[in-house]
Amino acid sequence: MARIAGVNIPTNKRVVIALTYIYGIGISLANKICESCNIDHNIRVVNLSDDEIIRIRNFIRENYVVEGDLRKEVSMNIKFLTDIGCYRGLRHRRGLPVRGQRTHTNAKTRKGRSRLPVAAKKK
C-alpha cells in the first residue's frame, strides 16, 4: 500500500479515486494533482513507481492542507466563531443549521432526535 499524507491509499484502485481517500482531496483536486505531477489518471496505484508516489506526496505536502491539519483548521474556525459570539457561532453551539436553512419542518439531522418523554400506556 502506498502511504500519502499519513493515509494508506488502496492499491487496486485508479490513482484519482485512491487520492480521494485522503481527507481534503476530492475528485477535481485529485485530477489537478495528477495533471501537475504528469501522471495518467487511469493508471492503478499498484503500477505507480516509487518516484511517482514521492512526486505526489511532495506536491500535496507543499500545496495543500489535508488530513489532521485541515481538521484542526476547520475546528479552530468553528471555535473562533463560537468564542466571538456571532450568529453563526451561536448556531454551531446550539447544533442548528448555520447557513439560513429553515428549521420548522426540516433540519432533523442537524437538530438530532427530539427529547420528548414517551407517553404512558393506558390501562
From Swiss-Prot:
Chain segments annotated as transmembrane: none
Gene3D superfamilies for the chain: 1.10.8.50, 30s ribosomal protein s13, domain 2 (4.10.910.10)
PROSITE patterns: RIBOSOMAL_S13_1, RIBOSOMAL_S13_2
Family to which the UniProt record says this protein belongs: Belongs to the universal ribosomal protein uS13 family.
Designated name of the protein: Small ribosomal subunit protein uS13
Keywords, sorted A to Z: Ribonucleoprotein, Ribosomal protein, RNA-binding, rRNA-binding, tRNA-binding
Highest classification ranks of the organism: Bacteria, Pseudomonadati, Pseudomonadota, Alphaproteobacteria, Rickettsiales
Cited InterPro entries: Rbsml_uS13_C (IPR027437), Ribosomal_uS13 (IPR001892), Ribosomal_uS13-like_H2TH (IPR010979), Ribosomal_uS13_bac-type (IPR019980), Ribosomal_uS13_CS (IPR018269)
BP GO terms, sorted: translation
Domain of life: Bacteria
GO molecular function, one term: structural constituent of ribosome
Chain residue ranges for the region called Disordered: 97-123
GO annotation, cellular component aspect: cytosol; small ribosomal subunit
Protein's job: Located at the top of the head of the 30S subunit, it contacts several helices of the 16S rRNA. In the 70S ribosome it contacts the 23S rRNA (bridge B1a) and protein L5 of the 50S subunit (bridge B1b), connecting the 2 subunits; these bridges are implicated in subunit movement. Contacts the tRNAs in the A and P-sites.
Assembly: Part of the 30S ribosomal subunit. Forms a loose heterodimer with protein S19. Forms two bridges to the 50S subunit in the 70S ribosome.
